[in-house]
Amino acid sequence: PTVAYAQEESTESTENTDTLTPDKKPATTITKQINEDVYQVLDFDDTQEEEFAKKGFITAPDSLQITDDDGNVVWNMDNYDFVRDADSPDSANPSLWRNTKSNTNYGLFQVSDDIYQVRGYDLSNMTFVRTDNGWIIMDCLASSDTAKAALELFKSEMGDIHIVAVIISHAHIDHYGGIQGVLTQDELADSSLSLDEQIASGKTAIIVPDGFENAVMSENVFAGTAM
């Protein structure tokens, strides 16, 4: 099949490229065929992934538009209505389209006992873990505006919380960029203390992987534009 596709593609290489414009164009015949073939490979009657995506749902606003202090929209899930309200077009892989639909489920979810997530408020999820000493936040989204909104949603159901620590899993911006949306400088624990001492101080420890600062700098220099 790969050879057949390649041969057919060569005869259609100019099918939709006669005029290079930003306007939407129909899928080529080969693209349609490849995407249609996905229906023969995967069981689209299996809705388990959709059920998983909705499992544990607690609450969400009817519409999700997050703005900054100046009223500028920084995150708008309404922009993805075209995915939720339509079947996969012939220009898209139907499995990826279905996966994208699942990703439009936003709000507060319970993952398991004492573990919650705010989903769809940014590129990544914000996870809350209840401990004996307070709450741990795992990853704090890409911007302070989205992180603040996610924390407010969580508090609307769980009440005011003491954040004992923020864990940043890795050096991509959507996992650390929103730190100022969940913490102020005055709330930070003294990083020169041991972790136990930071927790005992009543302030919030920030826990990152070894080499985090170097990874942040190097990844943004080499891959920041592409990402």
Where are these regions (language model features)?
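C-terminal segment of classical bacterial N-terminal signal peptides
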Residues: 1-5
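Charged, low-complexity, helix-prone segments enriched in Lys/Glu/Asp/Gln
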Residues: 31, 96-104, 151, 212-227
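Active-site metal-binding motif and surrounding structural segment of the metallo-beta-lactamase
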Residues: 133-134, 144-207
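N-terminal pre-domain segments of enzymes
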Residues: 8-100, 104
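Acidic/polar short surface loop at catalytic or gating sites that assists cofactor/ion binding
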Residues: 70-90, 202, 210-227
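Solvent-exposed loop/turn segments at secondary-structure junctions
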Residues: 122-125, 142-145, 170-175, 212-215
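Conserved beta-strand hairpin/beta-sheet module of binuclear metal-dependent hydrolase folds
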Residues: 101-161
